[in-house]
């Protein structure tokens, strides 16, 4: 099995002056789950190379076993720091696509024509699309047969209540 993990390249939290990016736990936990199951994992981002990490996700109080493992695992660090360019990825080369969250995907991946086309291709091929936390926001412009892909579907993600708990309401533009 081959999984494509798509990470954000966006590092600014709207117009707040704060940094954002990938929420590290949302990369590290599934990455190790996939890898430990013998899945071939490819990591990509719009710009390729090192994606930004949301600094809050790497605070001592937010450390998880997966993050501690990541910090000791050279192969995981290399996969993360040397992401492929999203524009070079094709759905026919993978069985599924996985988008971790953090706020970053709502800016670059939701608007990226490469991301939109990739998601539409996965969906049209009957392949699994997995999105965590804020990542469902990447479906904003994804369509199926001319209608929004999410029309008539139930989608879960990070809630407005959770945003309020972390002091980010309204979500900055």
Kindly label every feature range from the protein language model.
Residues 129:
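Conserved, well-structured core segments that form or line functional sites
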Residues 1-125, 137-173:
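Extended, subdomain-level signal for the structured scaffold at the beginning of enzyme domains
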Residues 132-134:
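Short, thiol/selenol-centered motifs that function as redox-active sites or metal-ligating centers
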């Amino acid at each position: 099995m081959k999984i494509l993990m798509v990470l954000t390249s966006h590092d600014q939290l709207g117009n707040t002056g704060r940094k954002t990016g990938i929420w590290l736990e949302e990369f590290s936990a599934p990455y190790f789950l996939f890898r430990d199951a013998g899945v071939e994992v490819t990591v990509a981002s719009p710009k390729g190379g090192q994606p930004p990490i949301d600094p809050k996700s790497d605070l001592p109080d937010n450390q998880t076993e997966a993050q501690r493992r990541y910090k000791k695992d050279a192969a995981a660090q290399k996969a993360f720091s040397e992401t492929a360019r999203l524009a070079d990825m094709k759905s026919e080369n993978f069985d599924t696509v996985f988008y971790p969250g953090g706020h970053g995907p709502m800016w670059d991946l939701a608007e990226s024509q490469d991301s939109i086309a990739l998601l539409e291709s996965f969906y049209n091929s009957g392949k699994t699309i997995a999105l965590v936390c804020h990542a469902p926001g990447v479906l904003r412009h994804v369509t199926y047969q001319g209608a929004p892909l999410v029309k008539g579907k139930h989608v879960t993600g990070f809630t407005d209540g959770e945003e309020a708990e972390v002091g980010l309401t309204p979500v900055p533009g």
